[in-house]
Amino acid sequence: MSFALALLLQTAPAATPPAAAEPCDKPVYMVVQGRTLDRARMMAYGKALAQSEIYQRLGGYYITLPQPVAVFEGDVPPDYVNLTVRFPCLANARAFWNSRVYQETILPLRQNPPAGDYTVTVYAEAPLRADMAGRVEAGRFLADFSQAGEPQVEPKP
């Protein structure tokens, strides 16, 4: 081994081990709400979303249907939807949103011009109240859903 190579190896920083993945065990809820402007295009969007199986890969699933079963206060337009998707953690919700398949193939189906006027927000799951322990299931995920293999796009600022 040459002297220069030996010197370089002595002064080179040691490779840092990859960071351990955060546990994906704090469920979040992605809420999509707003008015549907083009139902046919939204149906095509929903079909593409289902066919991609991205929710299945990331542990996402619907916990509500988009239309209310009752309105207790206020006026809800007939084209208004509120759809909630549960993910096992924020990282998986982000992996869904920033996935190449969603951003480049599925999302454009409802944009330009917009097929709906929606907001998409994510909320943490509230802790189970002590008085509810033993009365309801905690709703935890029993399988791991890794976001590591899902191709991503750069998140928008």
Give the predicted meaning of each segment:
Residues M1-Q10:
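Bacterial N-terminal signal peptides
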Residues L9-V81, P88-N92, Y123-P157:
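Short S/T/G/P-rich N-terminal loop/turn motif that feeds into the first structured element of a domain
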Residues A4, R41-A44, V101, T105:
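Exposed alpha-helical structural elements
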Residues S2, D25, P113-A115:
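A generic structural signal for short, non-catalytic loop/turn and secondary-structure boundary residues
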